[in-house]
C-alpha cells in the first residue's frame, strides 16, 4: 500500500518492492506467492502491506506485479465517477496466472459514489453472475473523514456502515455501494475470491438505468 519491503519467498528474494509513499501517490506494487510457501517480509523503512489470500492448487513460481502491469481507468460518470486500478484480474491481467483471487483498487473522489449502481455477486449463474466473496480495506484522506457503505438484498436485509480510515468490511452477499463524504477521498483495495475469476455482477434492477446515462454524461464532459 505504501513504502518499500524486501520479500523472501522460498529460495527467491525480491529486493525493495514498492515505492509510492501512500495509496494516492502512484500505482501499487504486488507480489503473487503460490500456496504453501514460506515467506518473510522485511520492511525497508515505514511500510504498509496488504496480504489477501485464497485457497489455490496452482503450482507456479512467485512473480512481481509492477506498476507497468496495473490497468487503470474510470468507471461511471458525474457524481458516481471513480478511478480504478486492476492489479490481479482476468480482464486487466489475462497473462498473469492465478487461482481464485482477484485484487484491485478504487479511488472515490469527494462526494462521489462508488460501485454505483449497486451490484451483487452472490451466486454462480454465468455468464450473468459469478459468486465471489469480497473484502474491502479503506483509507480515508484526510484521515479524520468518513464514507458510508450500504448492503442490502431482497430478503429484506439492509445494513449501513460508517467507513473510516483503516475500516475493513466484508461483502459476502447482497447489493453494495459506497459514498465519500464531501471534502474527503475514499480509497479502497478490494479482494474477491471464488471458483471463477470472471467478474460477472448483477446491478440492482431498480437503479440499473443509471448505467445507461454514462455515455451521455461522458460526452458532456461529466
What are these regions (language model features)?
Residues 22, 46-89, 150-152, 189-222:
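Double-stranded beta-helix
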Residues 40-45, 58, 94-97, 142-145:
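Secondary-structure boundary elements
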Residues 52-55, 106-107, 111, 141, ...:
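Structured loops at beta-to-helix junctions and adjacent beta-edge loops in soluble globular domains
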Residues 79-135:
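A short glycine-rich, His/Asp/Glu-containing loop-to-beta-strand
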Residues 22-60, 164-165, 173-199:
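Ligand-binding loop in jelly-roll beta-barrel domains
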Residues 1-15, 33, 110-111, 122-167, ...:
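Glycine- and acidic-residue-biased ligand/ion/polar-headgroup-sensing regions
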Residues 15-21:
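Active-site cofactor/substrate anionic-group-binding motifs, chiefly glycine-
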Amino acid at each position: 500500500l505504501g513504502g518499500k519491503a524486501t520479500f523472501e519467498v522460498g529460495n527467491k528474494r525480491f529486493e525493495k518492492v514498492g515505492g509510492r509513499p501512500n495509496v494516492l501517490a502512484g500505482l501499487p506494487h504486488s507480489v503473487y506467492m503460490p500456496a504453501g510457501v514460506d515467506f518473510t517480509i522485511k520492511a525497508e523503512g515505514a511500510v504498509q502491506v496488504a496480504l489477501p489470500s485464497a485457497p489455490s492448487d496452482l503450482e507456479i513460481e512467485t512473480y512481481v506485479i509492477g506498476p507497468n502491469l496495473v490497468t487503470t481507468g474510470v468507471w461511471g460518470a458525474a457524481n458516481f465517477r471513480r478511478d480504478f486500478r486492476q492489479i490481479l484480474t482476468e480482464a486487466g491481467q489475462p497473462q498473469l496466472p492465478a487461482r481464485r483471487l482477484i485484487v484491485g483498487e478504487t479511488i472515490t473522489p469527494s462526494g462521489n459514489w462508488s460501485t454505483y449502481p449497486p451490484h451483487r455477486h452472490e451466486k454462480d449463474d454465468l455468464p450473468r453472475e459469478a459468486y465471489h466473496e469480497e473484502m474491502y480495506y479503506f483509507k480515508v484522506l484526510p484521515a479524520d473523514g468518513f464514507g458510508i457503505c450500504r448492503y442490502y438484498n431482497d430478503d429484506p436485509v439492509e445494513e449501513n456502515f460508517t467507513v473510516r480510515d483503516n475500516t475493513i468490511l466484508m461483502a459476502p452477499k447482497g447489493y453494495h455501494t459506497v459514498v465519500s463524504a464531501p471534502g474527503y477521498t475514499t480509497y479502497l483495495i478490494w479482494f474477491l475470491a471464488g471458483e471463477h475469476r470472471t467478474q460477472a455482477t448483477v446491478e440492482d434492477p431498480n437503479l440499473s438505468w443509471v448505467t445507461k446515462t454514462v455515455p451521455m454524461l461522458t460526452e458532456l464532459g461529466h
